[in-house]
């Protein structure tokens, strides 16, 4: 495997993690102001689903690049 491809995939995983954490913080800050527990639970569920999807996409991306290189 090429080292630049490995570095690129690691950076992509870090980027996805930062995006997920940032969006979770935005959801929490917004729904703390509205203070609706049902909306907060739904938003947390949606953020969790997005986190799982982004993590799975980064793993698929990493495997695809490592199989190419």
Swiss-Prot record:
GO terms for cellular component: host cell membrane; membrane. Coiled coil: none annotated. It comes from His1 virus (isolate Australia/Victoria) (His1V). It is found in: Host membrane. The keyword Transmembrane applies. The chain crosses the membrane at residues 7-27, 42-62. Keywords: Host membrane, Membrane, Transmembrane, Transmembrane helix. The keyword Transmembrane applies. This is Putative transmembrane protein ORF34. It is a multi-pass membrane protein.
